[in-house]
């Protein structure tokens, strides 16, 4: 029996891939630089510390692999990406990134264009599994005459094809494949388009920073900014920085890392204390309950009140996506602080 088809963002979710490995190596290198107190100029050496060999592993050449790593270092420092093709230092003035204050600004998610392979967009293509059968159902069902037979095999005319998928649906050998750009297909708000040269581009007016494109790109061409550098610099500067732990931390590092060991490691990193995000989740639930009661009171006072329900989520991306998709219901969709934010409020009030 054939396995169930997975959505595009489900295909790599939960898998440890080289893309994830490279991302972690960059973050580790940046963290080590800050904790060891190395000079800011050492940032330029990070791509060479990560990629020590002289032959490419995943891309056309070693220079391209290091160029991608350079852009990932910028993201790890909370900086915007360089324009494609700009030959400049990773950070012109590193000091603003090595600070205890927030430096991250929108956009939070960006395309590393030198890593983008300009994947084919949504289209159908005949594979070498075509048997050149006599029935030729693919040709018969195409209302646009986009399927032709060349040298005994079916071929799709891209200029005529409208991507309806009927040919793939009726092929007895499943020889017609559906191709899609993973990042574009994973985006639920249609924020990813192709620029004039075919590279992926994010429409920041539409993007909700959910990160589905980040986990769906097999080439690691989309990344997110990090505030790790500023947090570590704050710890190194002696500021009281607390770590918030979600309930899932129990299984984050495998069965050998007990909660006691993880808490000890957090303290060893220099955090002043720890707090459970679950507390913030309880507070968020209580606040959402109050918002539901507000709607009930409004309806009791005026049965014709505009708000008929309350849409709530502690995910900011969900709230932005819902308001974008249903602008006429925007008043019914409430802002809810994430459990992380509610926990942070408690920490700041007590410390």
Segments (PLM) and residue ranges:
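Iron-sulfur-associated redox domains of electron-transfer enzymes in respiratory
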Residues: 1-82, 224-351
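Ferredoxin-type iron-sulfur electron-transfer modules and their immediate structural context
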Residues: 2-170, 174-186
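Switch II (G3) loop of P-loop NTPases
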Residues: 218
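A short alpha-helix capping/helix-coil boundary motif
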Residues: 106-107, 116-119, 162, 192-193, ...
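Glycine- and small hydrophobic-enriched segments that form the cores of compact globular domains
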Residues: 120-211, 215, 226-227, 237-238, ...
């Amino acid at each position: 029996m054939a396995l169930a088809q997975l959505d595009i963002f489900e295909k790599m979710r939960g898998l440890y891939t080289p893309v994830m490995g490279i991302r972690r190596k960059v973050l580790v290198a940046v963290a080590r630089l800050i904790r060891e107190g190395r000079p800011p100029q050492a940032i330029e050496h990070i791509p060479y510390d990560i990629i020590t060999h002289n032959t490419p592993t995943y891309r056309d050449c070693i220079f391209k692999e290091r160029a991608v790593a350079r852009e990932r270092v910028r993201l790890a420092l909370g900086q915007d990406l360089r324009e494609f093709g700009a030959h400049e230092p990773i950070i012109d003035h590193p000091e603003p990134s090595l600070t205890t204050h927030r430096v991250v600004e929108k956009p939070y998610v960006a395309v590393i264009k030198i890593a983008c392979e300009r994947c084919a967009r949504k289209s159908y293509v005949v594979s070498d599994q075509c048997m050149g059968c006599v029935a030729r159902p693919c040709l018969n069902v195409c209302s646009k005459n986009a399927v032709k037979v060349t040298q005994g095999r079916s071929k799709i005319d891209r200029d005529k094809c409208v991507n309806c998928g009927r040919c793939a649906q009726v092929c007895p050998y499943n020889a017609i494949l559906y191709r899609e750009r993973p990042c574009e297909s994973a985006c639920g708000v249609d924020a990813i388009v192709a620029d004039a040269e075919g590279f992926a581009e994010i429409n920041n007016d539409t993007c909700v920073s959910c990160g589905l494109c980040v986990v769906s790109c097999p080439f690691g061409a989309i990344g997110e900014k990090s505030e790790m550098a500023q947090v570590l610099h704050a710890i190194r500067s002696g500021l009281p920085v607390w770590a918030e732990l979600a309930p899932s931390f129990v299984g984050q590092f495998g069965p050998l890392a007990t909660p006691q060991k993880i808490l000890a490691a957090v303290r060893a990193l220099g955090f002043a204390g720890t707090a459970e995000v679950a507390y913030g989740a309880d507070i968020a639930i209580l606040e959402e309950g109050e918002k539901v009661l507000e709607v009930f009171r409004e309806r009791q006072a005026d049965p014709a009140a505009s708000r008929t329900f309350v849409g709530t989520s502690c995910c900011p991306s969900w709230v932005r996506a819902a308001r974008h998709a249903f602008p006429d219901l925007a008043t019914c969709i409430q802002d809810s602080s994430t459990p992380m934010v509610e926990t942070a409020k408690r920490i700041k009030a007590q410390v």
